[in-house]
From Swiss-Prot:
Entry cofactors: Zn(2+)
GO cellular component, one term: cytoplasm
Biological function: Involved in the hydrolysis of N-acylated or N-acetylated amino acids (except L-aspartate).
Binding site for Zn(2+) 2: D109, E144, H379
Gene Ontology biological process terms in this record: amino acid metabolic process
Protein name from the UniProt record: Aminoacylase-1
Pfam family, one: Peptidase_M20
Classification via CDD domains: M20_AcylaseI_like (cd05646)
Record family assignment: Belongs to the peptidase M20A family.
Subcellular location(s) of the protein: Cytoplasm
Organism, scientific name: Dictyostelium discoideum (Social amoeba)
Keywords annotated in UniProt: Cytoplasm, Hydrolase, Metal-binding, Zinc
Length: 408
């Protein structure tokens, strides 16, 4: 679709979508250059922090009372890969159809919120409005690969982050297919568990007892029985009080490995019972579950002789933000949305975002993407966002963020 007379904010959004920050080789230098150029154009003070190994772009609008706790608008600039053959258009072309639907990797997760935060900052600076509290923006890398190493997980433990003096963080949420908007106050802890079984070997023609695969299968069956219990719990209530995905523990068998390879090829010896078998599980645990008790459950599942486990991903702590009248940030956020006739639905985020690193420091964090009446397409083929929904999202943030920053 021709971009003549296109809204300038939509044009900026589409330009950012075209930058290839997809894994495994995200072009962070180009995204950093883009953000720095916009900060200069919008007269927003900025710096590029590189101590974690990959550029983190920080912007700041200083408040009249800089000693007060500040508000952080956090967004990640990286996106997941896209299978080009499964898209109807180039996933990095930011193509827009006649209905105003913009197709591209990152339209929902989360380059939309990146640019909406930036536009809010631009409007605040342009208006000359004086803020009570300082407003920070952070554009971070590597969220899509867990935020570890060079992303938010490392950044939160730096002196630079401590100096930001954060009182509240706003981060990404999810699209809502209904007229409601979803706000997330916690998320499930991602545990990736690798189980190894060791047992007796022998010829495939015999009934060998105590084999590795037998031991592993017994454990797998126990864990899949637990999975079925959680599945039934999720789908038990179909009324308004029914559980959401973030309320239950999901468990999926994602890795299976066994067999004796022949000459390091893809062929295996079918007549040899292997001495070792392995399985990997992706487990997502809601913050309402005691993690120490769940760890004991895994130990019980793997208690049989010859079984052991280790974590490929492990989070020992998983805090959530309280949504009660004692939380002044929440009361302000909720009241701001009420004034705009926005109906909020509160949930636990079913996957993981950088917010978990913030919450685990004891800092309140809300996951909120102002996207409604839109199918949830993060990480999916043909991910899109309508330009009208995008522009309304900027207005929604303008109705929320200044109120938070000017809060007593």
């Amino acid at each position: 679709m021709n971009s003549i007379q296109e809204n300038e904010h939509v044009t900026v959004f589409r330009e950012f979508l075209k930058i290839r920050t997809d894994h495994p080789t995200p072009d962070y230098e180009s995204s950093t250059k883009f953000l720095v150029e916009k900060a200069k154009e919008y007269n927003i003070p900025y710096e590029v922090y590189r101590e974690t190994g990959t550029p983190i772009v920080l912007m700041k609008i200083e408040g009249l009372e800089p000693n007060l706790k500040t508000v952080l608008l956090n967004s990640h600039v990286d996106v997941v890969p896209a299978v080009h053959d499964s898209w109807k258009v180039d996933p990095f072309s930011a193509w827009k159809d006649e209905s105003g639907n913009i197709f591209g990797r990152g339209t929902q997760d989360m380059k939309c919120v990146c640019m909406q935060f930036l536009e809010v900052a631009r409007r605040i600076v342009q208006s000359g409005q004086k803020l009570k509290r300082t407003l920070h923006l952070s554009f971070v890398p590597d969220e899509e690969i867990g935020g570890s190493g060079k992303g938010m997980e490392k950044f939160v433990y730096t002196e630079k982050f401590r100096q930001l003096n954060i009182g509240l963080c706003l981060d990404e949420g999810l699209a809502s297919p209904t007229n409601d908007f979803t706000v997330f106050y916690g998320e499930r802890a991602p545990w990736w568990v690798h189980i190894t079984a060791v047992g007796n070997a022998g010829h495939g023609s015999r009934f060998i007892e105590g084999t590795a695969i037998e031991k592993l299968m017994r454990t797998i069956n126990k864990m899949l029985a637990f999975r079925q219990e959680q599945f039934e719990s999720l789908h038990h209530g179909q009324h308004e009080c029914g559980k959401k995905l973030g309320d239950v523990t999901s468990l999926n068998l994602t890795v299976l490995k066994a067999g004796i390879p022949i000459d390091h090829s893809n062929n295996f010896s079918y007549n040899v019972i292997p001495t070792q078998a392995e399985a990997g599980f992706d487990i997502r645990i809601p913050p309402t579950v005691n993690l120490d008790q769940f760890l004991d459950q895994i130990k019980e599942w793997t208690a049989e002789e010859g079984l052991s486990f280790k974590f490929a991903s492990y989070i020992p702590k998983n805090e959530m933000t309280k949504l009660d009248s004692d939380n002044k940030w929440w009361e302000n956020f909720k009241e701001s949305c009420k004034k705009m006739d926005i109906n909020l639905v509160t949930e636990i985020f079913p996957a993981a975002t950088d917010s978990r690193f913030i919450r685990n420091l004891g800092i309140p964090a809300f996951g909120f993407s102002p996207i409604n009446n839109t199918p949830i397409l993060l990480h999916d083929h043909n991910e899109f966002l309508n330009e009208k929904v995008y522009l309304r999202g900027i207005d929604i943030f303008m109705g929320i963020i200044p109120n938070l920053v000017n809060m007593e």
